[in-house]
């Protein structure tokens, strides 16, 4: 352990990494042609190094949050104590309030915050979940996010085959990407449901806010007998009243929040009774500090928290540590625990980024007890894909 009174942030390095995809794939909002990540590396004068990641949406240039970190946040943090995490969170938030509060600015803050927690864990030789109060669970059930399109409409047969592949890989929870037109969505779900019949698989759907209220309701009604765990982003993030209306009309739990930011944004969702399940992304909601704020707020409103994650291995590791520490919202001996989003779409560098890649253990993810995030970054991989030299 270093000297708690003297440790200082010596440098902050931003790594923008990208890789083109051999086969682009689509979600409802467009075609993903490359995978990107904005990673931050924070170095201290005591030799501790922390890693963080800003959530980079499928269509979002990673350079945006990188510029935020380099130009707006780094000058605030140099020579500060990396252990003053909450103090620094508010310092960053307050300094960017007039041009931030949402989007890539908060993603930049999130990346820095994750790296600071990684440093704190390494400094104290403790995993982050222990610093958050302990682990409610040491193993986490993953769910396969996939079912993206490589042609567009008319892929029901291929998506059904994908469902069987996920099942063979021991996934018993799967999230299906919809939003390609109501008729096509329903055909795809029928095909997936048919091949998984009697296999005890739980499905979720995610339209990535492709529809207005009427179409979103029609889709939910058509799938009401599928026993869906949740219906994600049925309408646009701005249409909070639409969320509330759908939640009151449908018998499917409504989920959302990956495009919301900080406890202030989630307070609006909760006060409007807009969601059954909140889905903050740790790489964009304010980091580990930000998600702590949101979890506590959600508990007071009786809303479940199930973090969203679509980033690289750093974001996955942060999500695992946080999910381990989330209390069940509605306590019972058979209470439903949060599950880990495990993206199954093409990602050239996610596994390669770690010296110890994430592996499933009999269909579950083990929560690392190593210090900090519990990962070791493969710097050669960072340099291989880095494009902001």
Which residues are covered by each model-predicted region?
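Metal-dependent enolase-superfamily TIM-barrel catalytic cores that perform enediolate-based chemistry
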Residues: 133-250
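A cross-domain feature marking catalytic cores of carbohydrate-active enzymes
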Residues: 54, 144-146, 176-178, 205-209, ...
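Shared catalytic-loop signature of beta/alpha-barrel
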Residues: 221, 227, 238-255, 260-364
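Conserved, mostly hydrophobic/aromatic
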Residues: 9, 40, 47, 73, ...
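Metal- or metallocofactor-binding catalytic centers and their adjacent structured scaffolds
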Residues: 11, 43-123
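Extended hydrophobic packing segments that form well-structured cores
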Residues: 369-389
